[in-house]
């Protein structure tokens, strides 16, 4: 059995849950649902939901931090 040795992201992660953000400045809006699983290179994948379609997928924690809040 493989053990995950990656630290959990910043405790401020809880503040992201429920946030509505966009992919870059002009991208589609998405809602951050929560932590999903470890990703590549020390990153984590977060569960997100596309606002317009309801589709759920995973997205990089680092990218979420860089994406702007939806207006």
Question: Language model features by range: what are they?
Answer:
Residues 1-19:
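Mixed-charge, Lys/Arg-rich low-complexity intrinsically disordered regions
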Residues 42-47:
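Short aromatic-glycine-enriched beta-strand elements
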Residues 28-36:
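Short beta-strand-centered aromatic/proline hotspots
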Residues 5-7, 22-24, 59:
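Serine/threonine-rich, low-complexity intrinsically disordered segments
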Residues 36-39, 52:
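A generic structural motif
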Residues 51-71:
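Intrinsically disordered, low-complexity, charged/polar segments
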């Amino acid at each position: 059995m493989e053990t995950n040795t990656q630290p959990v992201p910043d405790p401020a992660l809880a503040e992201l849950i429920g946030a509505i953000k966009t992919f870059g400045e002009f991208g589609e809006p998405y809602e951050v649902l929560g932590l999903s699983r470890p990703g590549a290179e020390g990153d984590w994948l977060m569960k997100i939901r596309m606002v317009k379609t309801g589709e759920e997928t995973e997205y990089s924690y680092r990218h979420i931090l860089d994406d702007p809040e939806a207006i």
